[in-house]
Amino acid sequence: MASPRSAGGVGGGGGGGGGSGGAAAGDDAIWSKLREAGFDEESLKRRDKAALIAYISRLESEIYQYQHNLGLVLMERKELTSKHEQLRAASESAEIMHKRERAAQQSALAEARKKEENLKKSLGIQKECVANLEKALHDMRGETAETKVSYESKLAEALQLMEAAHKKFDEAEEKLLLAKSLEAESIRTHNAALRSLHDIDDREDQLRRDRISCELENEAKEKEISLQRKSLNDMKKILHEKEEVLLKEQALLNQRDENILERLAYVTHSEKRVEEEKNILEAERKVLLEEKYKLELKMEAIVSREEALIQKESLLDKRESELLILQETIASKERAEIERLNQEQAIALERRKHDFESEMANKQMSFDAAMEVTRNALHQRECALSEQESVVVQRSQNLDLQLAELASKEKALAGRSDELKEEEEKLLLHREAIHNELQKEREEIQRIKSDLEKEKAFFEEEKREAIQAQQDLAITQADRDELLTLQMKLKEEIDSLRAQKRELMADADRLQAEKERFEIEWELIDEKKEELQKEAIRIAEERRAITEYLKNESDIIKQEKDNLRVQFKSNSETLSREHKEFMSKMQQEHASWLSKIQQERQDLKRDIDIQRVELLNSAKARQMEIDSYLREREEEFEQKKAKELEHINSQKEMINTKLEHVAVELQKLKDERKEATLERERREQELSEIKGTIEALNNQREKLQEQRKLLHSDREAITVQIQQLNVLEELKIDSENKQLSLLQHDKSKLGSDINVKDNHHDNSHSSPKQRFGRKLDLSPVSTPISWVRKCAQVIFKRSPEKSASHDQFVQNGVPKKVGDSVDVEDVNLDFAKVGQKRLNHLVSCDQTEVLEPKRKHRRSTIQKVNGGEITSNCLSALEEKCSKNEHDEAPLGLSNTCKEHEYGDKGPENLTKPGEPASSVDVPYVNGIVDNSDSVQEEPSVEATVSATETSNVDGPEDNNDSDEEDEEEEEEKTSSAKKLWRFLIT
C-alpha cells in the first residue's frame, strides 16, 4: 500500500500544473489527519519514494528494452528484404547467363553438325582408318565407362548443391516469417505493458479509496484508543513476547531465504551444464562444418585435376593437329555420352550434398527445438520469478504497512522498527538479486538471438557461395564441354584415358573409403543424437522437478502470506488498541511533528524535483546514445552495402573477363581449325599432284619398257644379221684366198701363151671395166657390206657431210682404179690389191689389237674392198647401248671382232708367197666372174706380184690413218648419242 504523500505526488505528476494547488491543499489535510492519527511521516516518505523510484526505473528499462528489440527486429527485416532482393537479382542474372550460354552451346552444336555433314562427304576415303580407330574406340569406351560414372556422380552432387541452395533460400523466408512473428510478439508485449500501466493507475485509485476508508476507520478507532490505553501496560509484556516470536520467525525466514538461494544456485548450475552441452553441440557443428569444408576442398582438388587434364588435352591437341578431322567426328559421336555422364555426376553430387544439408538441417532443427524448450523453460521461470516478485512486493507492502503502523508506536518499538527495516533491506537485496538474474537471463536470450542472427548470416553466405559455385559450375561446364569435344580429337588419347582410368579407379577407391568413413561418422552422429535426446529428456525431467519445487515454494509462500495476514490482523487489532493509548501523546507531539513534516515535505519536493531533472537528463542522454548508436549502425550498414556492391561489381568484371577470355580461346580454335582445313586442302592438292606425277612416271615406265623390248628385239635381229655377216665374211675370205692362189698359178702360165693374154686383155679391157663399175654392188662380197652400211645408217644416222665424203671416197677409190686398169695386168693387179689389202687389214687388226686393246674395243673395224671403206662397228655400238640399259658386261660385237681377229691371225699362214702355185679350185672366180683361161705367163705374174705388194705397202698406211680418224669421229658421235639416250632413260 502506497503512502498518502507518494500517491499525491504521482497524481500531481499525471494531472499537470493546473491542479497543483488543490493537490497541495488536499495533501495538507490528509497529513494533518495522519498526524492526528499518530503516523510517522518521514518513514512513509522514504519508503514510498524508494519504491516509486525503483518501480519507475524498472518500467522504463523494460520499455527501453522492448523498443530496442523492436528496432533490431525492424533492421533485421530490412536487411533480410535487401538480401532477398539481391539474391533474386543474382538468380535472375544467373538465369540470363545460363540462357546465353545455352544459346551459344546450341549455335556451337549447329556449327558442329554442319561440320559433320561436310566431313561425312570425305569419309569414303577414310573408311579403313575409321574402321581401325573405331576398334580402338570400342576398347576405349569400355575403359572410359568408369570415368563417365564419376562425371555423372559429380554432376549429381552439383545439382544437390543447387537444391540445397534453394532450401536455404526457403529457410531464409521462414526466418523472415519468424522475424515478423517476433515483431508481432513485441507489439503484444508493448500492449501488455500499456495494460499493466493502466492496471497500476487503477491500483493507485484503489489505494486512494483504501486510504480514505482507512482514515475513516482511524477516526472510528481513535475513539477506541482511550479505552485501550488502560490495557497498554498488559500489552507491553505481550509485545515483548511477540517480538521474540518475530525474531524466531525472522530466523526461519532467513533459513528459507538460504534454502531458496541454494536452490537458485542449483538452477544456475543446471543452466551452466545446459550451456556446456550447448557448447558441445556447437563444437560438433564446427566439426561438421570442417568436414563440409574438407569436402569442398576435395571438390576443388577434383576441379584442379580436371584443369590439369584439360591442359594436357590442349598440349595433345597441339601435337596431334594432323588427326583433327577424324577426331572431330569421333568427338561429335561421344559428346552426347559425355554430357549424359556430366549430368549424372552432377545429380550424384547434388544428392550427396542434399543428404548432408538435410542432416545439418535436422541437427539444426533439433538444436532449435532444444533451444526453444530452454527458452520456454526460461520464460516460465521468468513468469514464476515475476509472480514470486509480485508476492514479495505484496509482502513488502504488507510489511511497509505493518512498519508504518508500528512506527506510530512509542520509542520502545523503535528497535523493532529498525529490525523490520533491516529485514526490508534484505528483501530489497533479494529482489535486486532476482532482478539481476532476470537481467542476465534476458542478456542470454539476446546473446542467443545474436548467435541465431550470426548463423542466419552464415547460412546466407553459404547460400551466396552455393549460387556463385553454381555459376562457376555453369561456366566451367561450358568450358568442359568444349574441351571434352576437343579431347576426342587425339590419336594418343587411348593411353591418356587408360592412365585417367587408373587414377579414377584410385579416386573411386578413395571416395569409397571416404564414404565408409562418412557412414561411420554418421552412425556416431546418430549415437550422439540419441545421447542428446536422452540428455534432453533428463533436462526436461529436471525442469519438471524444478517447476514442482517452485510450485511447492509458491504454495509455501502463499501459506506464509496467509499466516502473515492473520498475524497482520492480530497486530492491527493490537495496534488499534495501542493507537488509542498513544493518541494523547501524539496530540502533544503534534505541534513538533507538524513542523518536522513541513520541513520534510519541502525536502521531499526538492528531492523529487532534483530526481525529475536527473531523470529528464538521463532520458535525454539515453535518447542521444540511442540516436548515435542508430547512426553508427546505419553507417555500418551503408559501408557493408557499399562493400557488397563493390564485391558484386568485381565479380561481374571477373565474369566478363572470363567470358572475353573464352571468346578469345574460341576464336583461336576457329583460326586453328581454318588453318587445319587450309593445310588439309594444300596436302590434298599435293597428293593429287604426286598422284599425277606417279601416273606420268608409270606411263613413261611402260613406254620405256616397250622401247626396251623393241631394243631387245632389234638387238636379237642385229645379232642374227651379224652372225650371218660373219659367216659370209669367212666365205669371202676363203674365196679370196682361192682366187689369189689361182692368180699365182695363172701367172706362171702367162709366159707360154701370149696370144691368149692379148685376147684376154681385150676382153678384160672392154667387159670387166663396165662390169666392175656396173655390178660392184651386186657381187656376193659387196652385197652384205652395203646391207650392213644401210643398217648402220638407219640406226646411227650420220651427218650428211660424212656420208657424202664416204660415198665420194668409195667412188673415187673403186672406179678410178677400175678406169685406169686397161690391160690384163692392171686387172690382175687390182685382184692382187684386193687380196693384199684384205691381208694387210687383217694384219693391221692384229697389230692394233696388240698395241691398243682398249681402243680396239671402243673403235670400229674398217674393211676396204677395192679402195672402199665398210664400217662394221655399228653393231658393237648398239650392243654397248643395250648393255648399258641391261647392265651387260660382255657386248656381242666384241665377240664377233675377236672371231675376226682370230681369223686374221690364221690368215697370213694361208697366204702364199709370190712364186708359189695357186690352188686349182680358185681359178674360175675373179670377182664373181668365171675365168676359163688356163695358160698364164710367168713374167707378168712376177710383175703383178711386185706391183701388188708395192701398192699394198704404199696404200696400206694411208688407208689405215684415214680410217682411224673417221673411226674416232664416228665413235665420238656414237658415244654422244648413247649418252643422250641414257640421260633420256634416266629422266
Swiss-Prot record:
Q: Which InterPro entries match?
A: CRWN
One GO cellular-component annotation of the UniProt record comes to:
nuclear matrix
Q: What else is known?
A: Plants overexpressing NMCP1 exhibit enhanced tolerance to drought stress.
| UniProt feature, compositional bias: Acidic residues | 956-973
Q: From which source organism is this entry?
A: Oryza sativa subsp. japonica (Rice)
Q: Where is the composition biased (Polar residues)?
A: 944-954
Q: Which UniProt keywords apply?
A: Coiled coil, Growth regulation, Nucleus, Stress response
What is the protein's given name?
Nuclear matrix constituent protein 1b
- Gene Ontology BP term (one): regulation of root development
* Induction profile: Induced by abscisic acid (ABA) and drought stress (at protein level).
Localization: Nucleus matrix; Nucleus lamina
Please give the family membership noted in the entry: Belongs to the CRWN family.
Name the gene behind this protein: NMCP1B
Residue ranges with Gly residues bias: 8-24
- Give coiled-coil spans as residue ranges: 403-545, 594-717
Please give the superkingdom of this protein's source: Eukaryota
What does the record say about the knockout?
No visible phenotype under normal growth conditions, but mutant plants exhibit hypersensitivity to drought stress.
Summary of subunit composition and partner proteins: Interacts with SWI3C.
What are the Basic and acidic residues biased-composition ranges? 752-764, 898-908
Q: Where is this region: Disordered?
A: 1-25, 752-775, 887-987
Q: What does this protein do?
A: Architectural component of nuclear structure that plays different roles in controlling nuclear size and morphology. Involved in the modification of chromatin accessibility by interacting with SWI3C, a component of the chromatin-remodeling complex, to thus reduce the suppression effect of the complex. Acts as positive regulator of drought resistance and modulates root growth. Positively regulates the expression of genes related to root growth and drought resistance.
